[in-house]
């Protein structure tokens, strides 16, 4: 029974991995991301673009919390 589950697990992984890889490869920088050589102070690096520049995304602004007491 363990062998059967192991074989089914391996087959499941082999079928999922190519789908995930092709999904991630096709993603380019969207309108919220920019390809640059260096990210600005208000951005962080997400991935590399096709020409080896860095895909930068704007950081979310942190809300200032007021102390209640």
UniProtKB/Swiss-Prot annotation:
Entry keyword set: Antibiotic, Antimicrobial, Defensin, Disulfide bond, Secreted, Signal
UniProt KW Secreted keyword: yes
InterPro entries, alphabetized: Beta_defensin_dom
Any Gene Ontology biological process: defense response to bacterium
Localisation: Secreted
Signal sequence annotation: 1-22
Highest taxon above the source species: Eukaryota
Disulphide connectivity of cysteines: 29-56, 35-49
Statement: the UniProt record of this protein carries the keyword Metal-binding: no
GO cellular component terms, semicolon-separated: extracellular region
Function field: Has bactericidal activity.
Family, per entry: Belongs to the beta-defensin family.
PANTHER family: BETA-DEFENSIN 131A
Protein name: Beta-defensin 43
């Amino acid at each position: 029974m363990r062998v059967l589950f192991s074989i089914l697990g391996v087959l499941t992984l082999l079928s999922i991995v190519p789908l995930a890889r092709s999904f991630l490869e096709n993603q380019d920088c969207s309108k919220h991301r920019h390809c640059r050589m260096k990210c600005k102070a208000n951005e962080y690096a997400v991935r590399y673009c096709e020409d080896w520049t860095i895909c930068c995304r704007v950081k979310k602004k942190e809300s200032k919390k007021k102390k209640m007491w």
